[in-house]
Curated annotation (Swiss-Prot):
Domain of life: Eukaryota
GO biological process: maturation of 5.8S rRNA from tricistronic rRNA transcript (SSU-rRNA, 5.8S rRNA, LSU-rRNA); maturation of LSU-rRNA from tricistronic rRNA transcript (SSU-rRNA, 5.8S rRNA, LSU-rRNA)
PANTHER family per UniProt: RIBOSOME BIOGENESIS PROTEIN WDR12, WD40 REPEAT PROTEIN 12, 37
GO cellular component: nucleoplasm; PeBoW complex; preribosome, large subunit precursor
Signal peptide: none
Source organism per UniProt: Drosophila willistoni
Family listed: Belongs to the WD repeat WDR12/YTM1 family.
Region described as Ubiquitin-like (UBL) domain: 10-93
PROSITE patterns cross-referenced by the UniProt entry: WD_REPEATS_1 (PS00678), WD_REPEATS_2 (PS50082), WD_REPEATS_REGION (PS50294)
InterPro entries in the cross-refs: G-protein_beta_WD-40_rep (IPR020472), NLE (IPR012972), WD40/YVTN_repeat-like_dom_sf (IPR015943), WD40_repeat_CS (IPR019775), WD40_repeat_dom_sf (IPR036322), WD40_rpt (IPR001680), WDR12/Ytm1 (IPR028599)
Keyword line: Nucleus, Repeat, Ribosome biogenesis, rRNA processing, WD repeat
Protein's name in the database: Ribosome biogenesis protein WDR12 homolog
Principal location listed in the UniProt entry: nucleus
Function according to Swiss-Prot or TrEMBL: Required for maturation of ribosomal RNAs and formation of the large ribosomal subunit.
């Protein structure tokens, strides 16, 4: 018999880190043509024999650090693994499919979405901000910008006061304070310093500063303190308008528009650009720590504090996984194929080490496991036009904004402990 052609059997050991699903650690002879479907049937039969529980569990199977997405024999051949050896297969309970929960209708394209607790903050091409509940109730429309809003982020939020920032094509960033009880909002500072539209914004982990990236190619850092006007050496020499905030730091290095910015820690920033590069900045040195060059414009990136990896979205329809700590060989760990147009937005889960979401100009969101490069776990459908932004800040909700003037809310059925903010 020829196991390599799918004829015959392969010796496997079935392992799991989820002890309540463990089966006896003995070699099992299985057909080389088995797929995830047949392996699930086989494994559930073993579990029924062990526990007597008739309920079926859906599992995914890791073979040499990658999810099985076809026949076992084909997977082993692709990785040049000998069929004579016993193969270790790790199985994990499949992450459940997020369910569509709501559609929040706006008056124009929704280009920015950020969730904190039960509140959804959105920014639109009609120059307005909006606040919604996670249950779809519209709370507030906030005018102020004079051009489309491109990015938003929360600074802080408690039962009484919410503070957040928004950036716009009008070249400004606005810092807002919202009284939750009275539902009154005011712009407490207008941040001026960029010379073109401000496409990206990110608040530091300690909520004391925020960073912005612009079409003027500049990265700027600002104070997020309630009463701090900021000001770097150059701008502090100019007289300040009342309520106007100036940057405390300006960093130059990109050659084209900065498309994304994210804090890695309180002294390190990640940026991506249309100039095909990704840069990691050391703010204590006020300079570039690492530069990664690619062959396409990068539209978005997300750094995970759980696995310390970066996933990027780019113009060639692909997502890529980078390890910025690698000094030798390729730092591209994987390429993820599945979208059919520009990938505009990407974000890691804040609680699930291997999961991230993406949104693209093919009108689709996708939920990925970084160990499954050949296919996403799920397609999250609903948008009728291109997806412009996606957010998974709250583990319970995946929210995306699009050119169909909607925010789509998907509920995750695996979200940990419920908090009072989510009720």
């Amino acid at each position: 018999m020829d196991a390599e052609n799918g004829e015959g059997q392969v010796q496997v050991h079935l392992k799991t880190k989820q002890e309540h699903y463990a089966v006896p650690d003995v070699p099992y002879a299985i057909d080389g043509t088995m797929t995830t479907v047949e392996l699930n049937t086989f494994l559930n039969a073993l579990l029924r024999n062990k526990s007597g529980d008739e309920s079926a569990i859906d599992f995914d199977f890791l073979v040499f650090d990658e999810y099985l997405r076809g026949r076992l024999c084909d997977h082993l051949k692709e990785k040049a693994i000998s069929f004579e050896d016993a193969i270790e297969i790790e199985y994990v309970e499949r992450f459940p499919a997020p369910q569509p929960q709501d559609c929040l209708l706006h008056d124009d394209w929704v280009s920015a979405v950020k969730v904190s607790g039960k509140w959804i903050l959105t920014g639109c091409y009609d120059n307005t901000l909006n606040i919604w509940t996670h249950k779809g109730k519209h709370i507030l429309t906030i005018p102020g910008h004079t051009a489309p809003i491109k990015a938003v982020d929360w600074i802080s939020l408690d039962n009484d006061i919410g503070r957040f920032v928004s950036s716009s094509q009008d070249q400004t960033v606005m810092l807002w304070q919202w009284n939750v009880d009275s539902n009154a909002v005011e712009c407490v500072s207008i941040c001026k310093g960029h010379e073109r539209g401000v496409d990206s914004i990110s608040v530091s982990p300690d909520a004391t500063r925020f960073a912005t990236g612009s079409w003027d190619t500049m990265l700027k850092v600002w104070s997020a303190a309630e009463d701090d006007a900021g000001g770097d050496a150059a701008s502090s020499k100019r007289p300040k308008e009342n309520g106007v905030r100036t940057p405390i730091m300006t960093l130059q290095g990109h050659r084209e528009s900065i498309s994304a910015v994210q804090w890695i820690d309180t002294s390190t920033l990640l940026t991506t650009s249309w100039d095909h590069t990704m840069k990691i900045w050391d703010l204590s040195l006020e300079g570039i720590k690492t530069e990664i060059s690619t062959n396409k414009s990068i539209f978005d990136a997300s750094y995970s504090n759980l696995n310390r990896l970066i996933v990027t979205a780019s113009a060639d329809k692909n997502l890529r996984l980078y390890d910025p700590r690698t000094n030798q060989g390729s730092i591209v760990r994987n390429t993820y194929l599945g979208h059919n147009a520009w990938v505009q937005t990407v974000m890691w889960s804040t609680t699930e080490e291997f999961l991230f979401v993406s949104g693209a100009y093919d009108n689709q969101n996708k939920l990925w496991d970084c160990r499954s490069p050949k296919a996403p776990l799920y397609d999250l459908l609903g948008h009728g036009e291109k997806v412009l932004d996606i957010d998974w800040s709250n583990p319970k909700y995946i929210c995306s904004g699009g050119a169909d003037n909607t925010v789509r809310v998907f509920k995750s059925r695996k979200a940990g402990v419920e908090t009072m903010d989510d009720k």
